C-alpha cells in the first residue's frame, strides 16, 4: 500500500526527480509562467475535459478559491456538503450530524468563530430528497462533494445519484464542485472521467506533483464566461490584480515541473492498469479471508483503492459508515500489520496500490491480515 499523501508514488527515478532537481537548480519560484505551465494546462484540459485551470499549493486552497468564486457569481452565501465529507480544512466543511440529526461542528474541530449555520447546509450522501430540500431555500452557491466518499470508509454513489445531483444543481442554478483529490485513484481522468460526470468545477491535489505541495482547479467554459463577466476589467501589462485568489507560490516553476513529470510518467494508462490489477488481487484476497472466517464485514474497491469496513454491505451514507467503525479493531489491525512490514494508510482500513506495488506485497498483506484476524478470533471476547 502506498503513502497516503502521494497515492501514486513518486515519479520514476529516470525523469521525475531529475526534472524536479533541474528546476530547483534554476529556481523554484519565478513569479512568471514557464513552458511547463503550457504543457500542464493543455494536459489538464485534455485529460479532464475542462478548458481553464488554476494552480494552488493545496486542494484545501483550491476548494476555498472555488467556493469564493461560486459566492461571487451567485450572490449566495451557503454551500452544501455531505455528512462525513472530507475536503481538507475548508471551514464550511467542518460539520457533522449529531445523534439528534442536528448540524454541529465536527468532533475535535473548534469552530474558530465560524457560524456554520450561516455558511453551510449539511445532508447525507445519496439522499436526493434532502438535497432538493436544501437547495430549495435559494441560498446555496455550490454543492461540494467527492464523487465517491472515501474518508469515512468508502461510500459508493447509489444508482442514479449523480444524475440526480447534476439535475438538481442545474435546476436551482447551483454550481457543482467535484473534488477528486482522493478519487483520482479511479483512473487517469478520475471518477468523473470514468463515469462521464459533468462538474462545473473540478478540484485535484495531493499526488499530482510527486510530493511537491500542489493542487489545481478547473472550470467549464460556461463558468469561465460568468467569471469574466463579473471580474473588474483591467488592461493586461498595465495593471496587476490577483482578485483575491492564488498566492505568491501558487503555480511556481517547481510545481509545474513536478506536475509535468507526474502526468507524463506516473499517471499513465499503463501505470493505472498495473495498479488496478494489483488492487483487484488485494480485493479478492481480503474477500476470501472474510468469507473463510465468516466475518460480517465487506470489502470495496474503486480503481486502485481498496477498503474493508466492519459491516456486511457498503454503507449508504457517511453517517452509516461512521457508526460501523471500530477504533479499537482498526488500531489493532494497523499496529499488527505495521510491526510485520505492512503500512496501511493512517485512517481506517484503506489501502492504495501504486506503480511500485508488487504482487508479493499484496500477498504479504493478505497473509498478515488472515493471521491477525485469526488471532483476534481465538481470543476470549
Residue locations for each model-derived region?
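Conserved N-terminal phosphate-binding loop of PLP-dependent enzymes in the Aspartate aminotransferase
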Residues: 1-381
Amino acid at each position: 500500500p502506498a503513502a497516503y499523501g502521494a497515492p501514486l508514488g513518486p515519479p520514476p527515478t529516470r525523469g521525475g526527480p531529475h526534472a524536479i532537481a533541474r528546476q530547483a537548480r534554476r529556481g523554484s519560484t519565478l513569479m512568471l509562467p514557464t513552458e511547463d505551465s503550457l504543457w500542464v494546462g493543455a494536459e489538464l484540459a485534455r485529460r479532464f475535459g475542462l478548458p481553464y485551470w488554476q494552480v494552488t499549493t493545496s486542494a484545501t486552497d483550491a476548494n476555498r478559491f472555488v467556493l469564493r468564486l461560486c459566492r461571487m457569481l451567485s450572490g449566495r452565501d451557503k454551500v452544501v456538503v455531505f455528512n462525513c465529507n472530507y475536503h481538507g480544512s475548508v471551514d464550511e466543511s467542518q460539520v457533522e450530524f449529531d445523534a439528534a440529526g442536528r448540524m454541529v461542528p465536527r468532533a475535535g474541530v473548534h469552530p474558530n468563530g465560524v457560524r456554520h449555520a450561516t455558511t453551510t447546509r449539511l445532508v447525507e450522501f445519496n439522499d436526493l430528497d434532502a438535497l432538493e430540500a436544501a437547495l430549495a431555500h435559494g441560498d446555496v452557491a455550490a454543492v461540494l462533494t467527492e464523487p465517491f466518499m472515501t474518508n469515512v470508509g468508502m461510500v459508493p454513489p447509489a444508482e442514479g445519484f449523480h444524475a440526480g445531483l447534476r439535475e438538481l444543481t442545474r435546476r436551482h442554478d447551483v454550481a457543482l464542485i467535484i473534488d477528486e483529490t482522493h478519487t483520482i485513484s479511479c483512473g487517469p481522468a478520475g471518477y468523473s472521467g470514468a463515469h462521464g460526470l459533468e462538474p462545473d468545477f473540478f478540484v485535484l491535489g495531493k499526488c499530482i506533483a510527486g510530493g511537491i505541495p500542489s493542487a489545481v482547479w478547473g472550470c467549464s467554459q460556461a463558468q469561465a464566461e460568468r467569471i469574466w463577466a463579473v471580474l473588474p476589467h483591467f488592461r493586461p501589462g498595465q495593471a496587476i490584480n490577483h482578485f483575491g485568489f492564488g498566492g505568491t507560490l501558487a503555480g511556481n516553476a517547481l510545481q509545474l515541473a513536478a506536475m509535468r513529470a507526474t502526468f507524463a510518467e506516473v499517471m499513465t494508462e499503463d501505470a493505472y492498469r498495473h495498479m488496478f490489477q494489483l488492487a483487484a488481487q488485494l480485493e479478492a484476497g481480503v474477500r476470501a479471508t472474510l468469507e473463510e472466517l465468516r466475518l460480517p464485514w465487506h470489502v470495496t474497491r474503486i480503481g486502485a483503492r481498496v477498503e474493508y469496513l466492519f459491516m456486511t454491505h457498503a454503507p449508504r451514507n457517511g453517517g452509516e459508515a461512521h457508526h460501523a467503525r471500530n477504533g479499537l479493531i482498526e488500531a489493532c489491525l494497523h499496529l499488527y500489520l505495521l510491526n510485520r512490514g505492512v503500512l496501511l494508510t493512517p485512517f481506517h482500513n484503506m489501502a492504495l496500490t501504486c506503480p511500485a506495488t508488487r504482487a508479493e506485497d499484496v500477498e504479504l498483506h493478505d497473509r498478515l491480515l488472515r493471521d491477525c484476524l485469526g488471532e483476534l478470533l481465538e481470543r476470549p471476547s
